[in-house]
Amino acid sequence: IRSRMLRGETVPYIKEVNLPYLRHFEVDINFSLDYKNGRSELVRELVERAVTAKTGGVEIRTLARDDFFLHLCAHLYKEATTYPWIRMKRDMTLYKYIDLYMLLYETTTSAADEIAARAHALGLGTECYFAVSEAVNLFGDESGAGTRILRGLPDVDTNGLFSVISPEEKKEYRYTERDTVRRFFCADREKLLEEVGVWKP
């Protein structure tokens, strides 16, 4: 429990549902945008901009659309670029990429521009660029929203997108395979990493 709380998420809520192909329904509550419980002022800003959405006749509080999208990007980036998640094979979870793809599919040109601007304003350009480019590489970009967002983030160092940190070892690694599809279908992504130096938080 302590480990999970220090990594910015609660212990999952699990309900047995016994549906075909889905025995358990699991809900994670994430409250951090990076590997530790850092950037609390940023999380506070996202929560303060929360909106009320209606779904199934019920009103729920949720993040504003662009903030929700960026939170998904940051969460995906955190897991994909932190060594322990790669070791546990939780770094490229399919449903996270599908969530992003579906949101991109429904995103208008103006909304894509707003996402890029918001990512830049919040200092989440790298996280957004990484997640969007990976989702587009896996599924395509029928709506053009993914490409639009990427073009709106010209300052991102694309060479740095393939860095992985190991907080416990204080080491930095880099992927030797940059092709998203090849990495996704690799059974042991740890073998695709080469150590490149010391990681300084």
Spans of features found by a protein language model:
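Conserved NTP-donor binding/palm subdomain of two-metal-ion nucleotidyltransferases/polymerases, i.e.
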Residues: 2-201
